[in-house]
Regions:
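Sec-dependent bacterial lipoprotein signal peptides
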Residues: 1-15
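Bacterial signal peptide processing site
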Residues: 18-21
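Compositionally biased, proline/threonine/alanine/serine-rich low-complexity intrinsically disordered stretches
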Residues: 25-54
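N-terminal "mature-domain start" segment
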Residues: 43-85
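Secretory pathway targeting signatures of secreted, lumenal, and periplasmic proteins
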Residues: 67-119, 155-158
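Surface-exposed amphipathic alpha-helical segments
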Residues: 77, 175-207
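Second-shell loop/turn segments in exported
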Residues: 104-111, 136, 185-189
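Signature of long, low-cysteine stretches enriched in small and polar/charged residues
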Residues: 121-171
């Protein structure tokens, strides 16, 4: 079961590559981390509720030193992957375990970040209209604006449900796409929901 989150990541990576290919041909570009009329939606600040804060009480810090990022995670969560472009922690348990999965993708300096992030937002809004997503918003975490969305509870309790935050940043002179995913299966997501939001809002990253 521990390989299931990797399958989810690969599927998302393929969709990202498709969007990247389209956008690289665009003659309109926004500077990395800049805000244009294309992505000027007002962002909500990522502030945890009391329950979400309590869910992390007595926890630990998950550090991704290679990418200058860190999270607060609950007690007993353990690191499963720490590579240059992928970072994963998870709670105890089988398919109902909670997962933190973070991916970094290096982008060309000319990549149109404003158009891209707006496309992710619009795509999530379309999924919401189609009944696939029940939460979509511009969300600022640690001073960086991105798009957050949450999938609906799956019809089958053992299917996966994801909460994601997508953003672009400049790190060590490199333009990067940041994908922070919190997931579990349908049953586990409800059980771990306060933890998942708490971990997401705790994101610290250099940008």
């Amino acid at each position: 079961m521990k390989h299931i989150p990797v399958v989810l990541v690969l599927g998302f990576a393929l969709s990202l590559c498709n969007l990247t290919g389209k956008l690289k041909n665009s003659n309109t570009s926004g500077g990395p981390g800049s805000t244009s009329t294309e992505s000027s939606g007002e962002a909500e600040h990522g502030t945890p509720t009391a329950a979400q804060t309590q869910a992390l009480a007595g926890g630990q810090t998950a550090k991704w030193d290679q990418q200058g990022m860190s999270w607060s995670v609950p007690p007993k969560w353990t690191e499963t992957t720490n590579e240059s472009k992928m970072f994963m922690w998870r709670s105890p348990g089988g398919s109902e375990a909670a997962n933190l999965i973070v991916n970094i993708s290096a982008m060309d300096e000319s990549f149109p970040t404003d158009i891209s992030i707006k496309a992710f937002y619009d795509g999530a809004k379309t999924r919401a209209k189609n009944g696939e997503v029940d939460e979509v918003k511009w969300l600022e975490i640690d001073g960086l604006k991105g798009v957050e969305f949450r999938e609906i509870n799956p019809e089958k309790a053992d299917d996966f449900r994801r909460l994601q935050w997508l953003a672009y940043r400049k790190y060590n002179g490199q333009l990067q796409f940041v994908n922070v995913m919190l997931s579990s299966n349908g049953t586990g997501f409800i059980k771990h929901q306060d933890e998942l939001y708490g971990v997401m809002y705790s994101t610290k990253l250099v940008h």
